[in-house]
A protein has these predicted regions:
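Local sequence-structure signature of Cys/Sec-based thiol-disulfide redox active-site neighborhoods
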Residues: 1-33
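Disulfide-bonded cysteines in secreted/extracellular proteins and peptides
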Residues: 11-14, 56, 72
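Short alpha-helical
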Residues: 12-13, 41-42, 78
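Generic recognition of short, well-ordered alpha-helical segments
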Residues: 15-19, 45, 75
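Residue-level recognition of beta-strand->loop/alpha-helix junctions
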Residues: 34-38
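Short Fe-S-cluster ligation motifs
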Residues: 40-57
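Non-catalytic, surface beta->alpha helical segment in thiol-disulfide oxidoreductase systems
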Residues: 58-86
């Protein structure tokens, strides 16, 4: 797995991104691992260990472990496809 979507359960911006993540997976051959960080300290530690994430300061945060590209905040489907390399 190389594509990750870090989110918080009650995060309204994250909720807006969920359907776009689903759309990305349906329209391409990619799979995005969803990682909840507000109620899981281990997942939060994993997110905080990404050096490129330090300037973001929150969720949603999308991380491509192959290209080392991240997206901080909400994004369009076109931005997601570019980020995923799809």
């Amino acid at each position: 797995m190389s594509l990750f979507f870090y989110y918080g359960d009650e995060c309204p911006h994250c909720e807006k991104m969920m359907p776009l993540i689903d759309q990305l997976e349906k329209e391409t051959d990619v799979k995005v691992e969803r990682v909840e960080v507000w109620h899981n300290d281990e997942n939060l530690h994993t997110l905080e260990s990404i050096p490129e994430q330090k300037d973001c300061g929150g969720v949603p945060y999308l991380w491509n472990d192959v290209s080392r590209k991240g997206i901080c905040g909400e994004a369009t489907i076109e931005e997601l496809k570019s980020w995923a390399g799809a």
